[in-house]
Amino acid sequence: MAKMQAKVQADERDDGLREKMISVNRVTKVVKGGRILGFAALTVVGDGDGRIGMGKGKAKEVPVAVQKAMEQARRNMFKVPLKNGTLQHEVHGKHGASAVLLAPAKDGTGVIAGGPMRAVFDVMGVQNVVAKSHGSTNPYNLVRATLDGLRKQSTPGDIAAKRGKSVEDILG
């Protein structure tokens, strides 16, 4: 089974969402009469202000697979609380054999992240972050692990509500 890694393609549509294609894989189904070829596309969509979604699409042709993936990513968007263009706090994410460490960074640091993680932060609008991946480097698992970590973010307001205190008490 051949595998094609497509370059990360970016594109901004009229609705203001940023789209990036992370990978396109050629997949094969073996049946009695031979092989059936198809394509699987992995994409992320974001608004540049903390909203992010991931989609995976499969089809017989590449453009259809990418379109399906983009539509699924738009449907699966969720909001991540950002703080001045970076994350709220350090967080770990995991999916399958992939694990990621996401940490906030000072202004001017930039996005220090590899491959699929960089695409996620670019469409999300994060300007300063340090990210490290451990384990499997499968693009699908890395994106899912990154999104898992981002979902675990807590704002000072969330923490204050859990503890029954005010935000000023939490921040010191």
From Swiss-Prot:
One of its GO terms (molecular function) is structural constituent of ribosome. Part of the 30S ribosomal subunit. Contacts proteins S4 and S8. With S4 and S12 plays an important role in translational accuracy. Located at the back of the 30S subunit body where it stabilizes the conformation of the head with respect to the body. NCBIfam families: rpsE_bact. This is Small ribosomal subunit protein uS5. Pfam families: Ribosomal_S5, Ribosomal_S5_C. One of its GO terms (biological process) is translation. The N-terminal domain interacts with the head of the 30S subunit; the C-terminal domain interacts with the body and contacts protein S4. The interaction surface between S4 and S5 is involved in control of translational fidelity. Keywords: Ribonucleoprotein, Ribosomal protein, RNA-binding, rRNA-binding. Residues 17-80 form the S5 DRBM domain. GO terms for cellular component: small ribosomal subunit. It comes from Paraburkholderia xenovorans (strain LB400). Belongs to the universal ribosomal protein uS5 family. InterPro entries: Ribosomal_Su5_D2-typ_SF (IPR020568), Ribosomal_uS5 (IPR000851), Ribosomal_uS5_bac-type (IPR005712), Ribosomal_uS5_C (IPR005324), Ribosomal_uS5_N (IPR013810), Ribosomal_uS5_N_CS (IPR018192), Ribsml_uS5_D2-typ_fold_subgr (IPR014721).
